[in-house]
Amino acid sequence: KSISQAENIQNQIGIPVVVINGELTKMDQVYEFLGDMIGEKARAGELAAYCRQSVNDVVEKAKQIPQEKRVRVYYAEGSTGLETDPKGSQHTQVLDLVGGVNVADVPMKGGMGLTTVSLEQILSWDPDVILTWTMAGNEEGVYKIVTTDPKWAKLKASKDSRVYEIPNNPFNWFDRPPSSNRIIGVKWLANLLYPDIFKYDIKAEMKDFYAKFYHYNLTDQEVEAILERAGGKPN
């Protein structure tokens, strides 16, 4: 489908269109491919190596998590938090990689995903943690709903104050768009769910990532602002 869409676009605009596999575990290959294509092998190789090392490190550490200790997570999407995606979806790759248990027992939808669920279903799943997705133009919507609406207060995650907003600077760290920001998102979420196993200095990791990928030096204040609703200030 993606190839046919690319061909249609190419036919319409009359210039070459390239389709890239955006799977999280293949981000290193994406950078290597792009480096070859545009003649920036050295720079692409640096970014590819970072992606590969980061993913491999998380995968290996996640093997240490006992099944009974795995954290149950609900991914709250859409404008009200009543849309989500199940395990194995392209939209939940970060959660799957770090060893979280996706509580959403729903059919997998293609494309944009976003299966509609009811609050009653979420109450029956009763997750340990809720991750809220930030929609453009609705920056505080889902997080505010989940943390202030009395209907959500019955959930274990709400009672334990374990509702978090996924960072979204400059792109989402978890999903939509499936960018390289998911690489720092993996380290953030791994630390958040399993601090005894993943001992990343997330403040230092963030600064390193932004400098490497965006040529931007984050200040301590910017780091704290990004993490304000995403698990608190870094250690």
Where do the protein language model's features map onto the residues?
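Active-site/pore-lining binding-face segments in mid-to-C-terminal subdomains
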Residues: 129-192
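Extracytoplasmic substrate-binding proteins
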Residues: 4-83, 114, 165-234
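Short beta-strand and adjacent tight-turn residues that come in two discontinuous sequence segments
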Residues: 19-20, 105, 132
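Short, structured coil segments at secondary-structure junctions
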Residues: 12-13, 98-99, 159
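Alpha-helical, coiled-coil/dimerization segments enriched in small aliphatic residues
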Residues: 84-113
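Short, surface-exposed alpha-helical segments at coil->helix boundaries
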Residues: 3, 28, 85-92, 149
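Proline-aspartate-enriched helix->loop->beta-strand connector
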Residues: 1, 15, 118-135
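Alpha-helical scaffolding within the catalytic cores
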Residues: 3-4, 60, 114-121, 146-153
